[in-house]
Amino acid sequence: MGITAATEMALRRHLVAQLDNQLGGTSYRSVLMYPEKMPRPPWRHETHNYIRSGPGPRFLDAPGQPAGMVAAVVSDGTTVAAGYLTGSGSRAALTSTGRSQLERIAGSRTPLTLDLDGLGRYRVLAAPSRNGHDVIVTGLSMGNVDATMLQMLIIFGIVTVIALVAATTAGIVIIKRALAPLRRVAQTASEVVDLPLDRGEVKLPVRVPEPDANPSTEVGQLGSALNRMLDHIAAALSARQASETCVRQFVADASHELRTPLAAIRGYTELTQRIGDDPEAVAHAMSRVASETERITRLVEDLLLLARLDSGRPLERGPVDMSRLAVDAVSDAHVAGPDHQWALDLPPEPVVIPGDAARLHQVVTNLLANARVHTGPGTIVTTRLSTGPTHVVLQVIDNGPGIPAALQSEVFERFARGDTSRSRQAGSTGLGLAIVSAVVKAHNGTITVSSSPGYTEFAVRLPLDGWQPLESSPR
């Protein structure tokens, strides 16, 4: 709009200047054609061979005078002659209002713009005659100037409208193209909203397409952030599903493990009621009840320990002599399994680390019990302790039949079994290795297993330092 206004002003000044130049020539010719000595009224006494009849000054009929020209002769403030040239070249009279308008500008010597009565806008100029008494007023129509300006405004208007329509259309297209990735991001979010995330196994395959997740653009950064959020949610949902699955399996296995000794207790109790007069049979039944009760007690204690470890409750912290602990555990294992061969491989100096002595003793005891239960008589079980720059490594190695490859990834699961039967070897709760894994993890350590026929190794890595003494927790 500013450019249009500036162009209009410049063009109008140029056209008016051209008209003023033409007006100056017309005024000059009119002054030349006006006699120096002309009797004042009546005007009709003036004679020239080119004069035609009609109102107005006769110099309107001079050669070169343009059509539409107005002219007046003002003498002593009174218009003595006034008229204009029609399109056919004849003279016509001005209205009285038009004559008065020309009289009023007789004293001016610069071009002026007048809206002449009955004729329209004119550019007029007053000039003294050669006799020095009269004033010659001439004027040229501004119709061409106004028509040119109107045409220019129409052209500018059309061009402006076309430009606005084109700019608007281009803007809409550009905005739609720019917002298309954002719409796809919103579509992805809407698809996620429609997924049933509150139940069952949840899969979250929906992602923002890779081209819309380019971090080089703002929309791409949004898409990338949404993908990362969806990845995090998917991982959390998968973890939740895995946890729920483990809990369900754990509850099912725990129920089975408790159901078996409870059924035995109930059966032996009913048996004692039927054979009350047989002291030997009653004694045997009561011993079995006591055995199954002890089994339930161990199972419940193991479950409570795992629950405490799962909840992240801190263990007791203090210096633990791993060498002494290994010696004691192997001695106990030798008493429990005299048909096995037990060996120790310890460094010359005691190995002391920070930790919970009772739980670390349980780690070694459970590993040795696992080797004793799952290997045959005569198996050599070696307990080896070594130190590194930052860790202590405890290894329990046996030359038994080994662990099936399919089971090695599950040996630290709760109630893991090497076969499909629901039987459990005497004295085993099925939680020993699960407790080992949980205790080692609570000490910021790791445990691994490697096995093949004739060789099985459990390796526990525990940090040498980095533990801060904590208050003991309720056990």
Curated annotation (Swiss-Prot):
CDD domains: HAMP, HATPase, HisKA
TM ranges: 154-174
GO annotations of cellular component type: cytosol; plasma membrane
Gene Ontology MF terms in the entry: ATP binding; calcium ion binding; magnesium ion binding; phosphorelay sensor kinase activity; protein homodimerization activity
Domain HAMP: 176-238
Entry's localization field: Cell membrane
Stretches assigned to the Histidine kinase domain: 253-466
Entry cofactors: a divalent metal cation
Residues recorded as bearing Phosphohistidine in the entry: H256
Spans within the Cytoplasmic topological domain: 175-475
Pfam families associated with the record: HAMP, HATPase_c, HisKA
Main EC class the enzyme belongs to: transferase
Keywords: ATP-binding, Cell membrane, Kinase, Membrane, Nucleotide-binding, Phosphoprotein, Transferase, Transmembrane, Transmembrane helix, Two-component regulatory system
Enzyme Commission designation: 2.7.13.3
Membrane topology: Single-pass membrane protein
Ranges of the Extracellular topological domain: 1-153
Catalysed transformations (reactions): ATP + protein L-histidine = ADP + protein N-phospho-L-histidine
Superkingdom: Bacteria
Post-translational modification, as annotated: Autophosphorylated.
Keyword Glycoprotein found: no
Effect of deleting the gene: Cells lacking TcrX and TcrY show an increase in virulence in mouse model of infection, with significantly shorter survival times.
GO biological process: phosphorelay signal transduction system
Subunit structure: Homodimer.
Identification of the protein by name: Probable sensor histidine kinase TcrY
